[in-house]
Amino acid sequence: MQVSTAALAVLLCTVALCNRISATFAADTPTSCCFSYISRQIPQNFIADYFETNSQCSKPGVIFLTKRGRQVCADPSKEWVQKYVSDLELSA
């Protein structure tokens, strides 16, 4: 009986530790990544907000949120993207 109680205790501790570790990794996983960029400039008045992709993504990107709720990936090295980001930061 003591062996099964000890085994159960070890099993419960292992499960608790695994759940804690997986929760930590889940918090760091990127939610959105860009795999391609929009090919042309979109009108600035369509943009409501933006966020940058996580560093774990394969490509860097800026994701613009449009006023209609769409997400659009843009190349952060493009001049117009940098201007939109700067303007959004100033208006925040």
Swiss-Prot record:
PROSITE patterns given in the database record: SMALL_CYTOKINES_CC
GO terms, biological process: antimicrobial humoral immune response mediated by antimicrobial peptide; astrocyte cell migration; calcium ion transport; calcium-mediated signaling; cell activation; cell chemotaxis; cell-cell signaling; chemokine-mediated signaling pathway
Gene Ontology cellular-component annotations: cytoplasm; cytosol; extracellular space
Signal peptide, first to last residue: 1-26
Gene3D superfamilies with a match to the protein in the record: 2.40.50.40
Compartments, as annotated in UniProt: Secreted
Top-rank taxon: Eukaryota
Keyword DNA-binding: no
Site (Involved in GAG binding): R40, R68, R70
Keywords: Chemotaxis, Cytokine, Disulfide bond, Inflammatory response, Secreted, Signal
InterPro entries the record matches: Chemokine_b/g/d, Chemokine_CC_CS, Chemokine_IL8-like_dom, Interleukin_8-like_sf
Family statement drawn from the similarity comment of this UniProt entry: Belongs to the intercrine beta (chemokine CC) family.
Complex formation: Self-associates. Also heterodimer of MIP-1-alpha(4-69) and MIP-1-beta(3-69). Interacts with CCR1.
Protein name: C-C motif chemokine 3
Organism: Macaca mulatta
Species lineage: Eukaryota, Metazoa, Chordata, Craniata, Vertebrata
